[in-house]
Swiss-Prot record:
The gene is lpoB. GO terms for biological process: peptidoglycan biosynthetic process; regulation of cell shape. Residues 19-45 have a biased composition (Pro residues). Residues 18-52 are annotated as: Disordered. The lineage of its organism: Bacteria, Pseudomonadati, Pseudomonadota, Gammaproteobacteria, Enterobacterales. Residues 1-16 form the signal peptide. This is Penicillin-binding protein activator LpoB. The keyword Kinase does not apply. Regulator of peptidoglycan synthesis that is essential for the function of penicillin-binding protein 1B (PBP1b). It is found in: Cell outer membrane. Pfam families: LpoB (PF13036). GO terms for molecular function: enzyme regulator activity. GO terms for cellular component: periplasmic side of cell outer membrane. It comes from Photorhabdus laumondii subsp. laumondii (strain DSM 15139 / CIP 105565 / TT01) (Photorhabdus luminescens subsp. laumondii). It is a lipid-anchor.
Length: 189
């Protein structure tokens, strides 16, 4: 009996609740097109041009260092030399291949070392999985490459600094021991 009474009271209570009438949606307001009174003007400032890469005279930069190198004490003539790619540790872009070529030409003109041909170096780099523009150019990689090519010496070069003042550092290393036999530095012109 209680159940019936409870159900009856619930029905009466729920029937007595006012139901909300459904709301009528408001009609959309018409869109009035507005004609622009002024045409937008483009900004008057020009976009600045990126800085142009300055030409570096690599021949005059590396020649004094090569002259110091060939006069270094304790070097044997006609030994096989690997000229490793010049590394760029500056905050800008450099033509490292042009620098490496200028370095190779300056060394070959002195007739002190026998240079490993560039195509042999490129083939060895590919065999060892080294990139030509390897940004992580380490001395150990240069010595490993020189050992692979059976070179007696390796010339490791780094250009560092910023766009205003750059320096080049060269190190001649004995491949067998990794000993630095000669080190020189100069300004990049």
């Amino acid at each position: 009996m209680r159940r019936i009474l409870f159900v009856a009271l619930s029905v009466m209570f729920l029937a007595g609740c006012p139901s909300l009438p459904p709301e009528q949606p408001e009609p959309p307001t018409p869109v009035v097109p507005v004609t622009p009174s002024e045409k937008p003007t483009p900004p008057s400032e020009k976009v600045p041009e990126p800085p142009k890469m300055s030409a570096i005279d690599w021949e005059s930069t590396v020649q004094p260092l090569v002259e110091q190198l060939v006069k270094a004490h304790g070097l044997e003539n006609a030994k096989l030399l690997l000229v490793d790619t010049v590394k760029n540790n500056t905050n800008g872009a450099l033509q490292t291949m042009q620098a490496t070529d200028a370095l190779r030409q300056a060394i070959s003109s002195e007739h002190v070392f026998e240079l490993i041909p560039q195509n042999q170096v490129q083939n060895a780099r590919q065999s060892l999985g080294l990139s030509e523009e390897d940004s992580l150019g380490l001395r150990s990689k240069a010595i490993g490459l020189a050992r692979y090519l059976n070179a007696e010496y390796v010339l490791y070069s780094i250009v560092s600094g910023n766009s205003d003042k750059r320096d080049i550092v060269m190190q001649l290393m004995l491949v067998k021991t990794g000993e630095i036999l000669w080190s020189g530095h100069g300004d990049v012109k």
